[in-house]
Amino acid sequence: MIKWPWKAQEITQNADWLWDDALAIPLLVNLTAQEQARLIALAERFLQQKRLVALQGVELDSLKSARIALIFCLPILELGLEWLDGFHEVLIYPAPFVVDDEWEDDIGLVHSQRVVQSGQSWQQGPIILNWLDIQDSFDASGFNLIIHEVAHKLDMRNGDRASGIPFIPLRDVAGWEHDLHAAMNNIQDEIDLVGENAASIDAYAATDPAECFAVLSEYFFSAPELFAPRFPALWQRFCQFYRQDPSQRLR
Protein backbone atom coordinates (compact mmCIF):
# COMPACT_ATOMS: atom_id res chain seq x y z
CA MET A 1 0.00 0.00 0.00
CA ILE A 2 1.32 3.44 -0.93
CA LYS A 3 0.08 6.58 0.76
CA TRP A 4 0.83 9.98 -0.72
CA PRO A 5 3.31 8.87 -3.42
CA TRP A 6 3.70 12.59 -4.09
CA LYS A 7 3.59 15.57 -1.77
CA ALA A 8 0.77 18.10 -1.67
CA GLN A 9 3.21 20.97 -2.20
CA GLU A 10 4.20 19.50 -5.56
CA ILE A 11 0.82 20.53 -6.93
CA THR A 12 1.27 24.05 -5.54
CA GLN A 13 4.76 24.38 -7.00
CA ASN A 14 3.66 23.18 -10.44
CA ALA A 15 0.18 24.70 -10.36
CA ASP A 16 0.49 26.78 -13.53
CA TRP A 17 0.86 23.81 -15.87
CA LEU A 18 -0.59 21.04 -13.73
CA TRP A 19 -4.13 22.33 -13.35
CA ASP A 20 -4.34 23.27 -17.03
CA ASP A 21 -3.41 19.70 -17.92
CA ALA A 22 -5.73 18.25 -15.29
CA LEU A 23 -8.69 20.21 -16.65
CA ALA A 24 -8.00 19.09 -20.23
CA ILE A 25 -10.43 16.17 -20.21
CA PRO A 26 -13.83 16.01 -21.95
CA LEU A 27 -15.72 16.06 -18.64
CA LEU A 28 -14.30 19.44 -17.62
CA VAL A 29 -13.45 21.36 -20.79
CA ASN A 30 -16.82 23.12 -20.99
CA LEU A 31 -16.59 24.72 -17.57
CA THR A 32 -16.30 28.49 -17.61
CA ALA A 33 -13.02 30.09 -16.52
CA GLN A 34 -14.67 31.15 -13.27
CA GLU A 35 -15.99 27.64 -12.63
CA GLN A 36 -12.58 26.16 -13.36
CA ALA A 37 -10.91 28.52 -10.90
CA ARG A 38 -13.37 27.66 -8.13
CA LEU A 39 -13.10 23.94 -8.91
CA ILE A 40 -9.31 24.11 -8.65
CA ALA A 41 -9.58 25.84 -5.27
CA LEU A 42 -11.88 23.09 -4.01
CA ALA A 43 -9.63 20.36 -5.42
CA GLU A 44 -6.58 21.82 -3.69
CA ARG A 45 -8.43 21.76 -0.37
CA PHE A 46 -9.68 18.23 -1.12
CA LEU A 47 -6.11 17.00 -1.55
CA GLN A 48 -5.10 18.66 1.71
CA GLN A 49 -7.93 16.97 3.63
CA LYS A 50 -8.15 13.52 2.00
CA ARG A 51 -5.60 10.78 1.40
CA LEU A 52 -5.44 8.98 -1.93
CA VAL A 53 -4.30 5.45 -1.12
CA ALA A 54 -2.86 3.50 -4.05
CA LEU A 55 -3.26 -0.28 -3.72
CA GLN A 56 -1.81 -3.34 -5.46
CA GLY A 57 0.64 -1.53 -7.69
CA VAL A 58 -1.44 1.48 -8.70
CA GLU A 59 0.85 4.45 -9.35
CA LEU A 60 -0.44 7.94 -8.70
CA ASP A 61 1.38 11.06 -9.80
CA SER A 62 0.43 14.71 -9.38
CA LEU A 63 -1.59 14.87 -12.61
CA LYS A 64 -3.64 11.76 -11.88
CA SER A 65 -4.30 12.92 -8.33
CA ALA A 66 -5.30 16.39 -9.49
CA ARG A 67 -7.81 14.96 -11.97
CA ILE A 68 -9.28 12.67 -9.34
CA ALA A 69 -9.69 15.62 -6.98
CA LEU A 70 -11.30 17.79 -9.66
CA ILE A 71 -13.90 15.14 -10.44
CA PHE A 72 -14.61 14.58 -6.75
CA CYS A 73 -15.29 18.29 -6.37
CA LEU A 74 -17.40 18.80 -9.50
CA PRO A 75 -20.68 17.67 -7.87
CA ILE A 76 -20.08 19.92 -4.85
CA LEU A 77 -18.87 22.94 -6.84
CA GLU A 78 -21.83 24.99 -5.61
CA LEU A 79 -22.48 23.05 -2.39
CA GLY A 80 -19.12 23.33 -0.65
CA LEU A 81 -16.42 20.91 0.41
CA GLU A 82 -18.15 20.25 3.75
CA TRP A 83 -20.61 18.09 1.79
CA LEU A 84 -17.75 15.59 1.44
CA ASP A 85 -17.26 15.26 5.20
CA GLY A 86 -17.45 11.76 6.63
CA PHE A 87 -14.42 10.16 4.99
CA HIS A 88 -10.69 10.77 4.96
CA GLU A 89 -9.35 8.23 2.48
CA VAL A 90 -9.93 7.23 -1.12
CA LEU A 91 -8.71 3.69 -1.75
CA ILE A 92 -7.79 2.95 -5.35
CA TYR A 93 -7.44 -0.59 -6.70
CA PRO A 94 -6.04 -1.24 -10.18
CA ALA A 95 -9.30 -2.83 -11.45
CA PRO A 96 -12.74 -3.90 -10.18
CA PHE A 97 -12.37 -5.93 -7.01
CA VAL A 98 -14.09 -8.85 -5.28
CA VAL A 99 -15.95 -8.36 -1.99
CA ASP A 100 -18.09 -10.52 0.29
CA ASP A 101 -21.63 -9.18 0.07
CA GLU A 102 -24.45 -9.95 2.50
CA TRP A 103 -28.14 -9.18 2.20
CA GLU A 104 -31.37 -10.08 3.93
CA ASP A 105 -34.31 -11.44 1.94
CA ASP A 106 -38.02 -10.78 2.48
CA ILE A 107 -38.37 -13.51 5.10
CA GLY A 108 -35.32 -12.47 7.09
CA LEU A 109 -32.77 -14.98 5.83
CA VAL A 110 -29.25 -13.59 5.42
CA HIS A 111 -27.42 -14.55 2.23
CA SER A 112 -23.75 -14.07 1.38
CA GLN A 113 -22.00 -14.06 -1.96
CA ARG A 114 -18.71 -12.93 -3.46
CA VAL A 115 -19.33 -10.18 -5.99
CA VAL A 116 -17.22 -7.93 -8.21
CA GLN A 117 -17.51 -4.23 -7.43
CA SER A 118 -16.27 -1.17 -9.30
CA GLY A 119 -16.55 1.06 -6.23
CA GLN A 120 -18.00 1.30 -2.75
CA SER A 121 -18.93 3.99 -0.25
CA TRP A 122 -20.44 4.11 3.23
CA GLN A 123 -21.79 6.90 5.40
CA GLN A 124 -18.66 6.76 7.55
CA GLY A 125 -15.58 5.25 5.99
CA PRO A 126 -13.46 5.46 2.86
CA ILE A 127 -14.57 5.61 -0.74
CA ILE A 128 -13.19 2.69 -2.74
CA LEU A 129 -12.54 3.07 -6.47
CA ASN A 130 -10.55 1.33 -9.19
CA TRP A 131 -8.13 2.97 -11.59
CA LEU A 132 -9.49 1.24 -14.69
CA ASP A 133 -12.89 2.86 -14.25
CA ILE A 134 -11.44 6.14 -13.00
CA GLN A 135 -9.77 6.57 -16.40
CA ASP A 136 -13.11 6.03 -18.12
CA SER A 137 -14.55 8.76 -15.88
CA PHE A 138 -12.53 11.40 -17.73
CA ASP A 139 -14.88 11.19 -20.73
CA ALA A 140 -18.25 12.87 -21.19
CA SER A 141 -20.02 9.58 -21.84
CA GLY A 142 -22.59 9.15 -19.06
CA PHE A 143 -20.28 6.86 -17.08
CA ASN A 144 -18.40 8.27 -14.11
CA LEU A 145 -17.42 6.07 -11.19
CA ILE A 146 -16.19 8.96 -9.04
CA ILE A 147 -19.39 10.97 -9.41
CA HIS A 148 -21.42 7.80 -8.76
CA GLU A 149 -19.75 7.21 -5.40
CA VAL A 150 -19.84 10.91 -4.49
CA ALA A 151 -23.60 10.87 -5.17
CA HIS A 152 -23.97 8.00 -2.71
CA LYS A 153 -22.06 10.02 -0.10
CA LEU A 154 -24.30 13.04 -0.69
CA ASP A 155 -27.37 10.80 -0.53
CA MET A 156 -26.29 9.34 2.82
CA ARG A 157 -26.11 12.79 4.40
CA ASN A 158 -29.90 12.49 4.64
CA GLY A 159 -29.85 9.30 6.73
CA ASP A 160 -28.00 6.15 7.67
CA ARG A 161 -28.39 4.58 4.23
CA ALA A 162 -28.58 5.83 0.68
CA SER A 163 -32.23 6.18 -0.31
CA GLY A 164 -32.12 8.12 -3.57
CA ILE A 165 -33.37 11.23 -1.78
CA PRO A 166 -30.50 13.56 -0.84
CA PHE A 167 -30.69 16.30 1.77
CA ILE A 168 -33.40 18.51 0.29
CA PRO A 169 -36.21 20.58 1.85
CA LEU A 170 -38.95 18.38 3.30
CA ARG A 171 -41.54 20.05 1.08
CA ASP A 172 -39.69 18.73 -2.00
CA VAL A 173 -39.31 15.10 -0.90
CA ALA A 174 -42.62 13.77 -2.24
CA GLY A 175 -42.11 15.35 -5.65
CA TRP A 176 -38.51 14.13 -5.82
CA GLU A 177 -39.55 10.59 -4.92
CA HIS A 178 -42.36 10.64 -7.50
CA ASP A 179 -40.13 11.87 -10.33
CA LEU A 180 -37.28 9.51 -9.42
CA HIS A 181 -39.56 6.45 -9.41
CA ALA A 182 -41.11 7.59 -12.70
CA ALA A 183 -37.62 7.70 -14.22
CA MET A 184 -36.83 4.24 -12.86
CA ASN A 185 -40.00 2.84 -14.38
CA ASN A 186 -39.26 4.52 -17.70
CA ILE A 187 -35.75 3.09 -17.78
CA GLN A 188 -37.07 -0.37 -16.89
CA ASP A 189 -39.65 -0.13 -19.69
CA GLU A 190 -36.84 0.58 -22.16
CA ILE A 191 -34.81 -2.33 -20.81
CA ASP A 192 -37.80 -4.65 -21.21
CA LEU A 193 -38.16 -3.45 -24.80
CA VAL A 194 -34.58 -3.43 -26.09
CA GLY A 195 -32.51 -5.22 -23.43
CA GLU A 196 -29.93 -3.95 -20.95
CA ASN A 197 -27.09 -3.60 -23.43
CA ALA A 198 -29.11 -1.49 -25.87
CA ALA A 199 -30.72 0.79 -23.28
CA SER A 200 -29.75 4.46 -23.60
CA ILE A 201 -29.39 4.83 -19.81
CA ASP A 202 -27.31 2.45 -17.69
CA ALA A 203 -29.64 -0.35 -16.59
CA TYR A 204 -28.24 -0.16 -13.06
CA ALA A 205 -30.43 2.92 -12.60
CA ALA A 206 -33.52 0.72 -12.57
CA THR A 207 -32.38 -1.49 -9.67
CA ASP A 208 -33.34 0.79 -6.78
CA PRO A 209 -33.80 4.51 -5.97
CA ALA A 210 -30.31 4.99 -4.49
CA GLU A 211 -28.65 3.59 -7.61
CA CYS A 212 -30.99 5.60 -9.82
CA PHE A 213 -29.89 8.82 -8.11
CA ALA A 214 -26.22 7.85 -8.39
CA VAL A 215 -26.42 6.75 -12.03
CA LEU A 216 -28.42 9.79 -13.11
CA SER A 217 -25.91 11.99 -11.29
CA GLU A 218 -23.30 10.53 -13.63
CA TYR A 219 -25.42 11.53 -16.62
CA PHE A 220 -26.25 14.90 -15.08
CA PHE A 221 -22.60 15.93 -15.17
CA SER A 222 -21.16 13.89 -18.03
CA ALA A 223 -24.04 13.45 -20.51
CA PRO A 224 -26.72 16.06 -19.77
CA GLU A 225 -28.01 15.78 -23.32
CA LEU A 226 -29.25 12.26 -22.49
CA PHE A 227 -30.82 13.19 -19.16
CA ALA A 228 -32.39 16.64 -19.52
CA PRO A 229 -34.77 16.06 -22.46
CA ARG A 230 -35.85 12.61 -21.29
CA PHE A 231 -36.66 13.47 -17.67
CA PRO A 232 -37.18 17.26 -17.63
CA ALA A 233 -38.97 17.43 -14.27
CA LEU A 234 -36.32 15.32 -12.53
CA TRP A 235 -33.60 17.28 -14.31
CA GLN A 236 -34.87 20.49 -12.73
CA ARG A 237 -34.82 18.84 -9.31
CA PHE A 238 -31.20 17.78 -9.85
CA CYS A 239 -30.35 21.34 -10.92
CA GLN A 240 -31.91 22.69 -7.74
CA PHE A 241 -30.07 20.18 -5.55
CA TYR A 242 -26.64 20.49 -7.15
CA ARG A 243 -27.17 24.24 -7.85
CA GLN A 244 -25.76 23.69 -11.33
CA ASP A 245 -27.16 23.27 -14.83
CA PRO A 246 -24.59 21.33 -16.87
CA SER A 247 -26.77 21.58 -19.99
CA GLN A 248 -25.94 25.30 -20.13
CA ARG A 249 -22.27 24.40 -20.64
CA LEU A 250 -23.08 22.67 -23.92
CA ARG A 251 -24.39 25.85 -25.56
UniProtKB/Swiss-Prot annotation:
Enzyme class (EC, first level): hydrolase
Bilayer-crossing regions: none
Cofactor notes: Binds 1 zinc ion per subunit.
InterPro entries with a match to the protein in the record: MetalloPept_cat_dom_sf, MtfA_enterob, MtfA_fam, MtfA_N
GO molecular-function term, one example from the UniProt record: metallopeptidase activity
Keyword field contains Hydrolase: yes
Principal location class: cytoplasm
Superkingdom assignment: Bacteria
The keyword Chloroplast is assigned to this record: no
Record EC number: 3.4.11.-
Gene Ontology biological process: proteolysis
Record: residues binding Zn(2+): H111, H148, H152, E211
Required cofactor(s): Zn(2+)
Gene Ontology CC entries for this record: cytosol
Subcellular location: Cytoplasm
Gene3D superfamilies: Collagenase (Catalytic Domain) (3.40.390.10), Glucose-regulated metallo-peptidase M90, N-terminal domain (1.10.472.150)
Keywords: Aminopeptidase, Cytoplasm, Hydrolase, Metal-binding, Metalloprotease, Protease, Zinc
Function: Involved in the modulation of the activity of the glucose-phosphotransferase system (glucose-PTS). Interacts with the transcriptional repressor Mlc, preventing its interaction with DNA and leading to the modulation of expression of genes regulated by Mlc, including ptsG, which encodes the PTS system glucose-specific EIICB component.
Similarity annotation: Belongs to the MtfA family.
Quaternary structure annotation from Swiss-Prot or TrEMBL: Interacts with Mlc.
Name of the protein this chain belongs to: Mlc titration factor A
Organism in which the protein naturally occurs: Salmonella arizonae (strain ATCC BAA-731 / CDC346-86 / RSK2980)
